[in-house]
Amino acid sequence: MSEVENSNTVDLQSQLLPLELIEKCIGSRIWIAMKNDKEFVGTLLGFDAYVNIFLKDVTEYEYTPEGLKTVKLDNILLNGNHVCLLVPGGEGPKVKA
């Protein structure tokens, strides 16, 4: 193999697949943006192959015409079909006081 070919070779063992990355986040805080106008920040307790997500100690953020509304929840189960973005360690949107 030439030096050029070798430098373009991808080391697959050092890469994480998406579900592996989510699995590494179990027990950690995660920020989740949904397809609607809601976002959630909580501690990831678990998920399944469909990326249905179970969180605890959750803050829900909803964008309304009046501004950003926040709600505290003990637990929530999110439908994976509506998940748009996952941010490991994310803190959620900045709330103006």
Curated annotation (Swiss-Prot):
SUPFAM superfamilies cross-referenced by the UniProt entry: Sm-like ribonucleoproteins (SSF50182)
Span of the signal peptide: none
GO biological process, any: mRNA splicing, via spliceosome
GO molecular function: RNA binding
Listed GO CC annotations: Lsm1-7-Pat1 complex; nucleolus; sno(s)RNA-containing ribonucleoprotein complex; spliceosomal complex; U4/U6 x U5 tri-snRNP complex; U6 snRNP
Origin superkingdom: Eukaryota
Keywords: mRNA processing, mRNA splicing, Nucleus, Ribonucleoprotein, RNA-binding, Spliceosome
Subunit structure: Component of the precatalytic spliceosome (spliceosome B complex). Component of the U4/U6-U5 tri-snRNP complex, a building block of the precatalytic spliceosome (spliceosome B complex). LSM2, LSM3, LSM4, LSM5, LSM6, LSM7 and LSM8 form a heptameric, ring-shaped subcomplex (the LSM2-8 complex) that is part of the U4/U6-U5 tri-snRNP complex and the precatalytic spliceosome.
Protein name according to UniProt: Probable U6 snRNA-associated Sm-like protein LSm5
Organism: Dictyostelium discoideum
Name of the encoding gene: lsm5
